Structures are given as C-alpha cells and as structure tokens.
C-alpha cells in the first residue's frame, strides 16, 4: 500500500487574496471548488492551471492505483509577503495535511519557479517522486498579432 499526496503550492496566496479560500485545501471536491473560485475571480491566474494540473494527476493516479493505495490532493497556500512568512505557512499547512493523510510519497504540481522554492520544505517532510510544471500553451499567431499591435500603438 502506497499513499500518495498530490500537492499544488500557491506561495503568494493568490487563492486567499483573490478567491477568499484559506489553505490548506484538502480533497478532490474542495480542490476543484477552490480552482473554480480562483478561476472566476481571476481568469488569468496561473495558479488555477496548476491546481487543475494537480487534479489531473490525482485522477490519473486513482485510475492506475491498486485498491489498497491511497491518493489525496491538497493545495498549500503561503502569504502575500513571499519569503520566510509564506514558507512557514506552507510548512505548517503541510504538517497538518501529513498528520491527516500520512503520505508515503508526494507529487508536486507547480506553475513556476516561485512555487518551486517550496521544494526543500516539502522534501524535508515527505519524499517527492515527481515534479510537474504546468505551462499554459498559447497560439503563436495570437501572440504575434498582439505583439505587432502593441508596437503600432507605442
């Protein structure tokens, strides 16, 4: 039996500031609700995509796991004052999730370098088996058109 925790980290707490959701968020339903609230509050927020990526990994692990395996998903939130304060919040929330779920391994789903700064915090408490960086794809044609239009209006 292997217990895997899928983690999404919001180090600067956009989830709390923009959507009014406090971390930790634990469980598939609560995580999906949080992602929707953040996506509605700010459709351009990249943390929404990272959270959806965590849900994707959670669901794929459930599909592939044995019936004796456990899989859970959680969002850890930091603080708008990124640094020691946000890292302490993430550590405290991770300790709570570990106490409740007792994972053997973790999968970290992130949207970039800022959230990846939490890797030492997470790896000091649970083994990270995989790190997935979610990067939103955009149409090159749209990007080029926007760039050229911005040059015209300088």
Where does each model-flagged region fall?
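Soluble N-terminal domains of membrane-associated systems
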Residues: 1-128, 135
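Short, charged, surface-exposed secondary-structure boundary motifs
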Residues: 136-144
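Hydrophobic transmembrane alpha-helix segments characteristic of membrane transport
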Residues: 145-149
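Conserved small/polar residues in nucleotide/adenosyl-binding loops
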Residues: 152-154
């Amino acid at each position: 039996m292997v217990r895997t925790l899928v983690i999404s980290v919001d180090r600067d707490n956009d989830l709390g500031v923009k959507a009014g959701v406090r971390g930790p968020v634990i469980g598939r339903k609560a995580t999906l609700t949080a992602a929707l609230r953040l996506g509605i509050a700010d459709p351009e927020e990249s943390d929404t995509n990272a959270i959806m990526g965590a849900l994707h990994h959670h669901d794929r692990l459930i599909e592939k796991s044995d019936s004796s395996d456990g899989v859970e998903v959680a969002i850890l939130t930091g603080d708008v004052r990124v640094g020691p304060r946000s890292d302490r919040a993430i550590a405290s929330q991770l300790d709570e999730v570990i106490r409740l779920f007792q994972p053997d391994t973790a999968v970290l789903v992130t949207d970039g370098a800022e959230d990846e700064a939490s890797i030492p915090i997470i790896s000091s408490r649970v083994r990270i088996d995989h790190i997935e960086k979610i990067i939103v794809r955009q149409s090159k044609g749209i990007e080029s058109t926007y760039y050229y239009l911005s040059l015209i209006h300088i």
